[in-house]
A protein has these predicted regions:
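N-terminal targeting signals for export/organelle localization
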Residues: 1-43, 164-170
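Short extracytoplasmic/periplasmic juxtamembrane "stem" segments immediately C-terminal to an N-terminal membrane anchor
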Residues: 42-60
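Short active-site neighborhood of thiol/selenol oxidoreductases, capturing the structured segment around
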Residues: 56-71
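Short, thiol/selenol-centered motifs that function as redox-active sites or metal-ligating centers
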Residues: 70-77, 168-170
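Typically the conserved alpha-helix immediately C-terminal to a functionally engaged Cys/Sec
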Residues: 75-88
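Thiol-based oxidoreductase modules, predominantly thioredoxin-like and allied folds used
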Residues: 89-105, 135
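Non-catalytic, surface beta->alpha helical segment in thiol-disulfide oxidoreductase systems
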Residues: 115, 120-165
Length: 170
């Protein structure tokens, strides 16, 4: 009876070790797939952003996205924005401007940000070509990027997407 209990205990131990190994492998694969980063897409975009001044004066078209970390619509749109930014990174700047950072208050006022996400779209010469308010699909974001890069008319988008209202200021 003792041999049977030992054998059963060893099998349970093997199962636990196998489970731990599988979890470790899954975490390793996840980290490798994401470049070793567990940052959210919104954090990755913010980290990759140039300053607005540099982006608007470097001879490349620019998408300025006004966002906030608490904005659910911004977080939902971030994976599509990140993929679009990666596809067009050779020809287009994507700049994130966090409306909660007092540093960007002048830009928030200048571009009359009343809801987020708000995309301000600029030509290579830094002139504003248009604005989009609310969440946009991956297809819409790609169409915007292609039009800016090719200096073609911007696509017609269907109304205002979902937004997060700005908090009241006193």
């Amino acid at each position: 009876m003792t041999d049977s209990a030992s054998s059963s205990s060893l099998t349970t131990l093997q199962k636990v070790l196998l489970l731990i190994s599988a979890v470790a492998l899954a975490v390793s694969l996840f980290l490798l797939r994401n470049g070793g980063s567990i940052e959210s897409p919104l954090d990755q975009l913010a980290r990759r952003s140039l300053s607005p001044e540099v982006a608007l004066s470097n001879g490349r078209p620019t998408i300025l996205e006004f966002y906030a970390d608490w904005c659910e619509v911004c977080r939902d749109m971030a994976p599509a924005m990140l993929e679009m930014e990666k596809r067009h990174s050779a020809d287009l700047d994507v700049v994130l401007v966090n409306i909660d950072n007092p540093r960007w208050l002048d830009l928030t006022d200048r571009y009359d940000v009343s809801g987020i996400p708000q995309l301000n779209l600029f030509s290579a010469d830094g002139s504003m070509r248009g604005r989009s308010l609310g969440g946009r699909s991956a297809t819409e974001l790609d169409a915007i990027a292609k039009a800016l890069v090719a200096d073609r008319p911007l696509p017609t988008l269907s109304g205002i997407g979902s937004t997060s209202p700005l908090p009241e200021t006193t």
